[in-house]
Amino acid sequence: MAEKLSDGSSIISVHPRPSKGFSSKLLDLLERLVVKLMHDASLPLHYLSGNFAPIRDETPPVKDLPVHGFLPECLNGEFVRVGPNPKFDAVAGYHWFDGDGMIHGVRIKDGKATYVSRYVKTSRLKQEEFFGAAKFMKIGDLKGFFGLLMVNVQQLRTKLKILDNTYGNGTANTALVYHHGKLLALQEADKPYVIKVLEDGDLQTLGIIDYDKRLTHSFTAHPKVDPVTGEMFTFGYSHTPPYLTYRVISKDGIMHDPVPITISEPIMMHDFAITETYAIFMDLPMHFRPKEMVKEKKMIYSFDPTKKARFGVLPRYAKDELMIRWFELPNCFIFHNANAWEEEDEVVLITCRLENPDLDMVSGKVKEKLENFGNELYEMRFNMKTGSASQKKLSASAVDFPRINECYTGKKQRYVYGTILDSIAKVTGIIKFDLHAEAETGKRMLEVGGNIKGIYDLGEGRYGSEAIYVPRETAEEDDGYLIFFVHDENTGKSCVTVIDAKTMSAEPVAVVELPHRVPYGFHALFVTEEQLQEQTLI
């Protein structure tokens, strides 16, 4: 059943029809046999331990939370963050990307705060609730011959209609975006889920959106909303041709025709970027190679360190790929971009560049303390006149989750805020970069000076998450606040912290105590009071 809106787009209520019976029980037995014979249960699952461990129960709105300091008026709205939170125990392996999406929200109004946590009610979650157990294949299982067998079990469950893929099988656990009166929960293997924020801050899953049946492919977790035009730019990647499809969605929520883009083989493309004129795609050598998974006991996505990194720059309103320009830079992978803009003949991309990534690092079968990895801030330049490309390193150590004042999306901006990492997942601090300043050379660690204008250190045993910039009503780019979740492993307690984005002072503006711990997660978003009031949903 689809709920039609006046703009022609549709929200589809999710009502999967899984089935129990003899074939279901038989496949359960087969799966248990495969796991018993081929899976090493002694391997630790790091991302199901400590504060990575899920909180199984939802939390309805808890009002009047203790607030230390003050919550500025511009923070009236709802701060939301999504992340993996598996409701049921894994059958075998577990990758951090596998968990069911759970949104943690803090509703702020007139200096008071309310906390809520809700699962995104995906088709996948509803079906596993029907069975009372995990039934869908996990990324953490996709390694070696064991991975091939688990793929076959999944295919049999679908073919025999034990599982229903009518509404997709994604987790909606990666990121959030607000566009055309709708808060969307995203995961790049599925369509967006529409979430309504209620007056008391509660979160309600309404269903998936397919833009009046025009969306027939996956949808990136990192679409870009142009703050001037109100349009949203997005893409999807696939294991079958076309491997990449670009889309534009009007400010009124109308999805334009697809633009297939040719790349040589299926890859993982987690993010992209826009300028006022262009869209920038990243053909990076993180390849989908199931044969190598079986033969070489690798993850199903494996990185090829011998291939160049390719960047495609396409006029953002192009009707086809004929005008795309491809540029090459040294081998790398990129999870997240900060922003992009144009300077004369050049397109500039600010990004977090990673060398020799290994997705197996987040499969959980690793030591407690992961090796530091070189995910560093870079400036890349693509000359549209000469066809040349160059890059320059802007940070001395690992940073990720880059954020900006989103009023500058697609335009030249000065400041980038990011997270300081001591491993692939644990955030030890928040950092502020000034792109107008030169990076200090010879540094091996991040410290104030040069292009680093401030560092907010979380302290021993305290770890944070992606920090979202919320502007005050002012013309200055960095005159606002950063808001983020923090967990204290010393006490087991979590909070939301607000700091001054201009000064990066060690003294927080506000700390909101939360009723229980909040597991580490992925991306966050601040939904303004105005956006809450303009939600176009029932």
Swiss-Prot record:
This is Carotenoid 9,10(9',10')-cleavage dioxygenase 1. One of its GO terms (biological process) is xanthophyll catabolic process. Fe cation binds at residues 222, 270, 336, 523. It comes from Arabidopsis thaliana (Mouse-ear cress). High expression in flowers and siliques. Also detected in stems, leaves and roots. GO terms for molecular function: 9-cis-epoxycarotenoid dioxygenase activity; metal ion binding. Cleaves a variety of carotenoids symmetrically at both the 9-10 and 9'-10' double bonds. Active on beta,beta-carotene, lutein, zeaxanthin, all-trans-violaxanthin, 9-cis-violaxanthin and 9'-cis-neoxanthin. With most substrates, the carotenoid is symmetrically cleaved. Probably not involved in abscisic acid biosynthesis. The gene is CCD1. PANTHER family: BETA-CAROTENE DIOXYGENASE, CAROTENOID 9,10(9',10')-CLEAVAGE DIOXYGENASE 1. Induction: By drought stress. The keyword Plastid does not apply. Belongs to the carotenoid oxygenase family. Binds 1 Fe(2+) ion per subunit.
